[in-house]
């Protein structure tokens, strides 16, 4: 008699559970490997300041100049600087400006300078490590950027009784790190963020810090990233070609900030953003602002020329037509706190 292989299922009750167990075990092993595998993560420990503790106010600009010169290839106009309101003395407010990824202090100039002048405040312009270099640009790590932040804060806190931090794009999460890890909270007057990067626009940005990303991401998207600057000044003061590793370093900072859940009362914050920002996810920027636990907060959607969204939406280089509006928003916000 011929066997009926369709009706005869002698091992079906055994094979199916065994297959399910095997698949489940494999999934568990892969999940464990994925969870514990090495991945790019920010070492958020605060480095020690490199600024000499015993230097007078008059000596700080000279130290900063020599420190910048030690890097050898800093583009003129991109270097970190101290701008005194009048003379070397402590002012009621100091403006600390933190530029964004691949940019320099010229990014939104002259907005920080005009805001500072309005209040008779000193200004510290940060230059994040690896930025603004003519040779080997953007080769620094995110942890090197933290060192730049610590040094900039050390100077700003010495030359101002309170500090207004103005930051653009990735400068915003770096400023939040500074607030959490380094500074005395009562020394921060306020935060003013322009296009803050708490998530990049590309929905696959999270892959930049997946396990072994430093090995496989450059193979997928290329070892270099480049873009076409919109004018000669943008070409000078932004790095428009850099290794993909630099983008991974940026994502490390964003990841750290996205996990932060501040619960204590914080310094006032103003956030300025454009809908449909081509670089960052503006919804994430708004969400971070709304969960920031501060009594004084202002959220400003840029409506001037809103049909032409820009990431760097103000400043002489990229959008001079919005500069005065931005200065007015910033000064009114600060005045409302004082």
Predicted region positions:
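Catalytic histidine neighborhood in serine/cysteine hydrolases
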Residues: 292-313
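Gly/Ala-rich beta-loop-alpha elbow adjacent to hydrolase catalytic centers
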Residues: 166-175
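Active-site nucleophile loop of the alpha/beta-hydrolase fold
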Residues: 192-203
